[in-house]
Regions:
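Intrinsically disordered, low-complexity, charged/polar segments
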Residues: 53-74
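Acidic, low-complexity, intrinsically disordered interaction modules
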Residues: 21-54, 58
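Generic low-polarity alpha-helical segments
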Residues: 1, 7, 24-27, 38, ...
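Mixed-charge, Lys/Arg-rich low-complexity intrinsically disordered regions
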Residues: 1-17
Length: 74
């Protein structure tokens, strides 16, 4: 894969939040104070493999919002 490709994360409404490079790290912040780092691989403009699971990026944001997990570049 091209290392210059970016993964553009959005909020649950589809508004762009930030981008990370392909194979970059995402930090997940849980309500109990725990943090988890996930490796992200770009699949296409709207899909990524996050911690080994394929997601549509808008669906990932909705799932994180539902589970009260915030996320940011690591």
């Amino acid at each position: 894969m091209n290392g210059s490709q970016q993964i553009c994360f959005t909020d649950s409404a589809g508004k762009a939040l930030f981008s990370i490079p392909d194979s970059g790290l995402l930090c997940l912040f849980y309500g109990n104070g725990d943090r988890h780092f996930a490796v992200c691989h770009r699949l296409d403009d709207t899909h990524a493999e996050i911690d080994g699971v394929n997601y549509s990026l808008p669906d990932f944001a909705k799932r994180m919002k539902h589970n009260q997990i915030s996320f940011a570049p690591a």
